[in-house]
Amino acid sequence: MSYHSDVANDELTHSIIGVAIDIHSTLGLGHSEEAYHNALCIGLEDEELAVESEVEVPLRYKGEDMGLRYADLVIDDEVVVEIKVKRHLTDKHFRQLGTYVEFLEKSRGLLLNFGRPTLDIRRYANDQHVDKKGA
């Protein structure tokens, strides 16, 4: 897994971040993860982006199912978005995003933390995946 803060700011992630910043500015602090999740779905769909919500992430080891996890959002079948409302992000949050990006075979992900006065944005790049549209 590779965690990067310097992943290329491509047009798609730029659009996602723009919507997230608008939501954070408009709604402010103090809402649930579900509220920000729903607002992101509305805002991203208004931008005519394809939004998948609560995407199943099948976990497997040696071909055996270990259960399911759920990624908050997958945008345009390319970018995994995880939403948090935390005072501070931890390595566990980054590992969670990385697991989802890799198991879903996507090239990149965004971790958006609405629990701070300024929206906290972290980027993840899956170096093992070559994005057909160019991350």
Describe every region a protein language model picked out:
Residues 47-63:
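A short acidic/basic microdomain associated with nuclease active sites
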Residues 63-64, 122:
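Short, well-ordered secondary-structure micro-motifs
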Residues 28, 51, 73-87, 100:
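Conserved catalytic cores of phosphodiester-cleaving nucleases, focusing on short active-site segments
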